[in-house]
Amino acid sequence: MSNFDDLQILDQLQTSARFRGDTRIRRFKGSNNSKSPFGLNPSSRISQWPRITFIRAKDNYNPAEELCQLIDEQNAHNEAKHQSKEIMLPKETNVKSCEDLSKTGEIKALDIVLFKAITSKGDTLKVKKIPEYAEAFDTTKNVEVSSFPEKSMNENVLIQHSLNLAPSDKEISSTEESEQLCYKEQESEKELYSKDNDDSLDILNVPNLVNDDIANNNAAPPPPLAQAQEQLSTENEDEFDIDDTTDKMTTFTMNKFADLSVLEEDDDDEDEDEELEGEKEEEEEEKEKPEISNYDETEGKVNFSLEDSESLEFDEGSDDYDYAKLTTELVGNTDSLAEDEDDILEEDEDEDEEELLAIFDASDDSEIEAYLSIGDTLQNDFTIYDYDSEDEEYNNPSTQKTEKVSQSKKGAKVKEEKGLKKDRKLPKKMRKAQKKLERKAGKAVAARMGDAFSNSLDDESMNLYAELQEQWLKDKSKKARRRAEREKLRSEGLLGKKSKKKLLRESQKPSSSDSDNASLTRIDKIFINDVYQRMQQFKHSAIEEISLPPCRKYVRRLVHALANDLNLKSRSYGSGNKRYTMLSKTHKFDASSVDLVSLTRIMERLQTRVEYQSFSKSGRKSRMTVSSVRSSKATRVYDGQIVGEDAPEISKENPGRRLLEKLGWYAGKGLGHPENEGSKDSLRAIVKVSRSGLG
């Protein structure tokens, strides 16, 4: 058997009709096929192909593997056929042909791989077995149909081929000699080539030479089949004179892989006729079968399907069957549930429970099995259902459907199921009327429930309902008020965090529209008025010191100026934004001088004294200084001055003084033991301005 390289197989696949026009084959390195249909155009490169199908010919299409597979299939088919029909093939002819072929070795066509040819549609054409006497025909002439007998024409196939083979002198060259040879071969090997239409398979076989002249090597062997024509496709069948009486048509074709292959066109008309006849016979058999009528449960009879009746053994000789007898036998074979039912009822009576009034067969569509998702059940698997007998009877539509299907024939199952599905879908008008009734029923039920709920309300629930309604109205009014406020702020652009920060920045900036002071904002004025109100508290209370809330630097300066005019001490503590001012009384403080007139006078004076001084080059923040027309003596400090020298005596209402008096202290007495009494004067703090000395 000759072997083919990958490149040779690629050359054959490229021009074969197996692949479509859009299929391209990528060659291996070393391929020198100059007849490539793709050319050297850059657009035909692999990278430019829209859709590429790469095929490795050795893996995809291997003629050697296919030939081995065909040989194995043929051997298995022959063995099975011989075992079934017990037909012994004549061994002499086979051995003789094999010996002849092995001795001569002149037919070199046997070394070439034979394979199934493939049409342009991708369908494989089956190969027909070639009769042994086919080689005896004249290869240069077409055999007439009338020259063959009728039986040989029906069993065998007319072979037409035109090969450019040079016939030898001893070959048969006339149709008369070929007819005689056909008759001889038909009588000797009639059993070998007779086939049934059902068991016929298309097989591949190498023709055996029966001609004595060729077998004895007396004549010159024919030239090798490789010199035959390249290909004869099935499209050229009309060129041959073919009689319509033949059952099958085969033609010899040539391919580049092998020298000879046989294409066969199967005629499936006989198979279709056989299928139709088989269906008709089945229908007639079903009509002849007895139709068993269904019995109602109310009459005490049993229903059973046709499948159950077919499983019974009937006497073939008797035409009429005793159905009553058969049904009684069938029922007698099944287990009775009477004892189980009595036991269950007795247990329920002992436990004083409701009686179970009925036992139903649990089919595949029962409620419990559907709930538990159980599959198929056994034949005698039952489930107990408990329901009130005063209600309507229990009719499960799913079980009714299964009974109908079981009672019907096999062919009518699908029709009944379709009929049930159609019945479920009501007409459009009926569906609308049903929905309308459902809506009315739902409204009526809701109205009855509402009336029952309203009648059951007592005084307490009514009071609770009134309270809840009142609270709901309050919440609603509160939300409406907040909504109005938010709408107002939104219209002014003051809603949100960004708007609030913007408003604060604008309030801190100096406003030219302020008639009182160009540098004081509304918040600053409110703070100063608050300071004035706190200072008036010194009139009516014994408070010596007060602390003011933290404020900005220039506001603290204004507070210090105000305290100086009122003869008060002022001092700031803390750092940063938390720096605040402390005010304390002096002996010069006159409470009567603190009035609205003095405050307005101070505010008018401060209006012209507050100025901003900025240092742009140094990058400092703006600094505000307050300049006064006159300076008070209270603000000046002298060297050697006693701190609090002019301070008034602590009043008797002071809680500290009252505590000391309870302990035995009085004015002019020193602190300490009477025998070792301390200084009678209070401790003093002397101011030192100069830096000389330690004291």
UniProtKB/Swiss-Prot annotation:
GO molecular-function terms, A-Z: nucleic acid binding
Places the protein is found: Cytoplasm
Official protein name in the record: G-patch and R3H domain-containing protein C30B4.02c
GO biological process: rRNA processing
Superkingdom of the organism of origin: Eukaryota
Compositional bias per record (Basic and acidic residues), positions renumbered to this chain: 182-198
PROSITE patterns found in the cross-reference section: G_PATCH, R3H
InterPro entries for the chain: G_patch_dom (IPR000467), R3H_dom (IPR001374), R3H_dom_sf (IPR036867), Splicing_assoc_domain (IPR051189)
R3H domain boundaries: 525-587
Assigned keywords, A-Z: Cytoplasm
Species classification: Eukaryota, Fungi, Dikarya, Ascomycota, Taphrinomycotina
Region (Disordered): 168-200, 213-242, 257-317, 332-351, 388-448, 475-517
One matching Pfam family: G-patch
Acidic residues biased stretches: 262-286, 307-317, 337-351
Transmembrane annotation, as ranges: none
Gene3D superfamilies according to UniProt: R3H-like domain
Domain G-patch: 652-695
Entry GO terms, CC: cytoplasm; cytosol; nucleus
Feature: compositional bias, Basic residues: 421-434
